[in-house]
Each structure stands twice: as structure tokens, then as C-alpha cells.
Amino acid sequence: MKLRNLKIAHFKNLRDFEINFGQQPFTTVLLGQNGTGKSNLLEALIIIFRDLDLGAAPAFSYTLDYECRTYEIHVEADHTRQKRGEQVQIAVTKPDGAREKITYNRFSQDPERSYLPSYVFGYYSGPSNRMEKHFDQHQNRFYQDQLRGEEKPRRQLFYARSVQSQFALLAFFTETEQEEQPGRQSARQFLKDLLGIEKLVSVYFVLHEPPWTSKDGDARFWNARGVLGDFLAHLYDAALAPMRLKKRVVSELGSSTTLEHFHFYLRGEEDLKKVFAHYGNQQEFFKALESTYISKVLSEVRIRLQRSGAEEPLTFSEMSEGEQQLLMVLGLLRFTKEEEALFLLDEPDTHLNPAWSVQYFDFMHQAVGDLPTSHVLMTTHNPLVISSLKREDVRIMQKRKTGVFVELPRENPQGMGVSNILTSELFGLRTTLDLPTQRKLDRQRELTVSDQRTLPEEAEWHRLTQELDDMGFQVGEDDELYNAFIKKWLAREDSDLREHIVLTPEQQRSREQMMEKIIEELVAEGHWR
């Protein structure tokens, strides 16, 4: 699954908008100031694939090109057309180059899902449900399929929630040696090297009587059927002394009721693998674990882990938010490594420490191996995360008077260093210094090249020069070339820009051109020989 190109007529602040993703992307990172529309772009893609999967009328007009299962797919959607059959037009180019137009019904109802990704994952690190709400129809369909006892319930659109980090961790412990691939770090090695997790000590499931009823199914578990019923039966067989208890539960509104609860205790990896033995792969096992949450029977999961150098086991809830965040994203990538999937991640790095931020894309590649079949589109405001990327992996979204535009960086972030990344077009900062220090530098430079300093200004200059020298800055007035450059610079610089935190691309280019012009003048004047 690879996105190629997207044009949007009008969605929120994206009007006459276009973005090209390149030819062979695994990851595409969106940069831009707040309000440029990065999250809106992710939201638009979720809506597009939601509607394509459901065979629904388009919510807005767009043109989308992407590759899926060796097919090149071209979708033209116009929500203003009166006839429903004309609103979405699709052309498919086969591997042999033959191009065929197909109907929307054939496209969305194809039982083999030849033209759509197996999964579209969404993740948003903030508290808003702006992204989550677009997954409601698919989650409800998945929920209803489970209640009906469908053996393979459908769920192509998947919104990642924090509770699923626990399921991802449990699925990591089930990986076998046969599943290891070239270029991909083993699950056990990943847990040990990155998180210091030596082993799984125990897992304690608490499940409660659901709000739904069922006539047929396993009578032990409220007549649960399908994926949920099978999983509860496997859990029951593997657990040490399963317990059924009645417990009074208080609702959010303050009312109380008595519900039946099951308690299942698994003694580490051996018991967990007894449950896993009934599933073909980690993906199916993860789906079974998640069925307890989707079906509203999960009360809690307590996972105890042994960490390197720790005397006492720790619980999953004691892990940091950054660890839980990383487990979920990498787990989903890992479990769908052989599937055609699209990951739409809105700032998935918010809780990562600097060391993990620098390695973020290495972690991703270790999760999927050498031949990724997915496309990860993510937003970030973290310069460390993009420090290893080539320019082709990055898109800068910029807001101008006529709309939002997307550009490729002029240089590779890789090799620039964090300070240069921050002051380049990638983030546009005027300086990486704190503002009080930068203001001291600006004022000291003004005084340095002043032809006539008053006595108070002379005292101010000496004070600032000493303060900056103590901080490690070389700002003396004995450097003739430096002073000549600063004098020309201050004479031409827009003084208002000194109070700007972020510069526009146009302002950055103007300053670069001014700097080049000044250097040419200094060379012509004989300052360089």
C-alpha cells in the first residue's frame, strides 16, 4: 500500500490542495506550523478510505492515486454530481499496464479486497475525538459481527487506543523463531534491548457480564459466540483456577448493579502460549484479545513483567506513556507486516525521550523488516525524529494567503544536526538560542558596530560583552571581518524580524540572499584574499 498523489477540492482549510507522496515511500512525515492542516490531511484520508470501504457517497471532492497489491488505482470523486453512480469513478492499472475502468460497487464489494488496503490505522495522541469518530461505523460493524458469532469479523479501519498497548505487549511474547525475518529484530530482543523486559511474570484478566444478551453460544460466558466465545474458552482452559464471582458495580452516574465476573490468572509465557496455540498468527491473537474490549466484557488486565536489574516485577500500568505509545505503534506495524496497510499517525512521538526520538524510524524498520508493504504517514513537531530522514521522506505544509501548499525540503535532514534542522525551512526558527540570550546578542552587535557610543552605551556594551563571553560567545570588537559583516547586515535587516520566533520561507530565503550579497561585497572590498 503506497499513497501516490492526492488532490482535495475543499476540506476544512485544505482548498485546491495537492500533495505528492513520491514513488516508493514507506514513511512520509508532515511538518508545518500549528494550523497548517496536517491533522486535517490525515482526517481527510481517513474519511476517503472509510467511504471507499463502505461504498458510501464521498463527503467531499478529491482525486486520489495509490498502489495496492501491484495495482495502480485512480479514484475521482465529485460529491456535487447528482447521480450517485457518477460521484465516484475508478480506473485500475494492472501490472501488465492494462488500464480498466470499474464500477464503484465492484470496487468496494470485491470479496478479495484487491483494490483496498487490508487495514487503515489511525492514531491521535491528543484528547480530541476528531479522528476517532470517523472509525465509529467500522467499530460498530465489528462489534455486531462479534455478537452474531462471525468467525472472521471484518474490521478494515482501526483506531488505536491506549488499552491496545497491553494487547500488543502480550502478542509480542507469542512470537516464534519461525516468524523472525531478515532485517527485523526479534520480538524478544526488542523487548529486552529497548524496554529492559526479561520475561512475562503473569497476566490477570477480569471480565464482567456484558450489557448485551445472546440466545446461543457458550453458556459459561453469557452465551458469547465467535471470536469472543472461543477466546474465553481458551482462556478458561489455560488459566490457573478460574473464578466466577458476583460483584457490585457503580456506574458513572452513581447507580449500582450486581454483575457476574470471571477471574483468569495466567502464569507467565507458558500459559499465554497455550492460549496462543489456537491462533494462526499474532494478528489473529491480537484480534481475539481485543474482542474482550470491543464486546464490552473487559474489566481490567493486569500484566506483571520482570525488568533487567529490578528485584520486584513491575506492572504494565507502571510503564511510562512513551513506552506504552511505542509498544502500540510498533506492535501494530509488526502484526500487519505482511499486509497492505496504511498508518495515519498524528504526533505518535509526543511522549518519547530524545534517545528514542532519534531512533524512531530505525524502530519502525526493525518492526517490519526489509520489505515493508505498508505506508506510514505521520505528523511531528520533533526535529530529532526526522534527523535520520532524506528529503524525499518529508513534506512541509505551509499556509499562504492563497491557501495551504506542500513542498519538499531543499536539503536532507539527515546530517544537518538538530540546530540546523530547527533554523532551516523545516521548522523556520530564527534562532535556537533562548530569547533573553538572543536579545543580548542582537543588542551587543548593534553597539559593536555603532560609530559613536555614548557613555551609558559603552557601559552597556562592556557588560553585555562580558556576559556573553562568560557564556562562551566570541563577541569581541577586534574581528574586523565580523564587524564589517554585522554592520552591513544591521543596515539592511528588517529590525522587526528580531522579535519573530518563526520566519516564513520567504523571509528565510530573503535573509539567505542578503547574506550572500553581503559576502560578495566583502570579497569585492578585499576583506578576503
Which residue ranges define each predicted feature?
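Generic structural motif
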Residues: F11, Q24, R69, P95, ...
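Extended helical coiled-coil dimerization/tether regions that scaffold
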Residues: G22, L170-Q324, L330-L342, V523-W528
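Residue-level detector of alpha-helix boundaries and kinks
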Residues: T36, N105, R130, R155, ...
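N-terminal intrinsically disordered, low-complexity tails enriched in polar/charged
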Residues: M1-L6, R99-K101, R529
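Switch/communication elements of ASCE P-loop NTPase nucleotide-binding domains
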Residues: M1-D65, R69-E72, A277-A288, Y293-T432
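Acidic, Mg2+-coordinating catalytic modules of nucleic-acid enzymes
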Residues: M1, P111-F121, P127-F221, K399-V404, ...
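Contiguous hydrophobic segments
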Residues: L259-E269, K274-F276, E347-M364, S374-R410, ...
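Nucleotide-state sensing region of NTPase/ATPase domains
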Residues: A56-G149
